[in-house]
Regions:
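Catalytic alpha/beta core domains of metabolic enzymes, predominantly
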Residues: 126-127, 138-215
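Active-site beta->alpha loop and helix N-cap motifs at the rims of alpha/beta catalytic domains
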Residues: 2-142, 152-154
């Protein structure tokens, strides 16, 4: 079974002056970080400016990352979108591209009920036979994935394996760990205290720029 832990940098999305994904540059960033010893990558999340990417660009990044990393680390692909249908379609593609897991923010912009958020994750997870990480990013989505809401998701989504916790409620790291979830802290500044209360690693942007320092 794939181990999801350690330092997993959140990738940037290099673009050309023409506004296209800079494939060569992206591959170089991945290789430089692998050579430094990182454990994997969180692709097309907040650091990768996912909300500015169209679906074809997301799919392209999934294919590049899966091909370039090629078992030298884990690839967790973000498939979040404002609608469940779009997120599920991206999840299905990511699975076909060969990534190791998917991650997903809750649906955003229009506020959903907790029931709708749970259903969102059930549908997205069902579209891809892959482990799922919830992406708790309340500062951007306006949705806090509470411990109670996470329990509800866990009850109906067997593929749920963990989350990236980018929330100010630090105490929930311990609670999520007690639930058996693999919790990545979303702030490299909090990596050591998070590891001490049960986090399995860190997903953040700064380590991508200087992986040797963080390793």
């Amino acid at each position: 079974m794939t181990r999801f832990e350690g330092l997993v940098p959140a990738t940037i999305t290099p673009m050309t002056e023409a506004g296209e994904v800079y494939e060569e540059g992206f591959r170089r960033v991945l290789d430089l970080n692998i050579d430094a010893g990182v454990h994997g990558f969180w692709v097309a999340g907040g650091t990768g400016e996912s909300v500015l990417l169209d679906d074809e660009e997301n799919r392209h990044l999934a294919c590049i990352a899966a091909e370039q990393v090629s078992g030298r680390g884990i690839v967790i692909m973000h498939v979040g979108a404002p609608t469940t249908a779009r997120a599920a379609a991206l999840a299905e593609h990511a699975a076909g591209a060969g990534v190791d897991a998917i991650c997903c923010v809750p649906p955003f912009f229009y506020r959903r009920t907790d029931d709708e958020i749970v259903e969102h994750y059930r549908v997205v997870a069902s579209a891809a036979d892959l482990p799922l990480f919830v992406y708790n990013l309340p500062g951007m989505t306006g949705v806090e994935i509470t411990v109670d809401l996470m329990r509800r998701i866990q009850d109906v989504v067997p593929q749920l394996i963990g989350l990236k916790h980018s929330s100010s409620i630090f105490a929930n790291v311990h609670e999520f760990a007690r639930m058996g979830l693999q919790c990545f802290i979303g702030s490299s500044a909090l990596m050591l205290p998070a590891l001490s209360v049960g986090a399995v690693g860190c997903v953040d942007g700064p380590p991508l720029m200087a992986p040797e320092v963080w390793m």
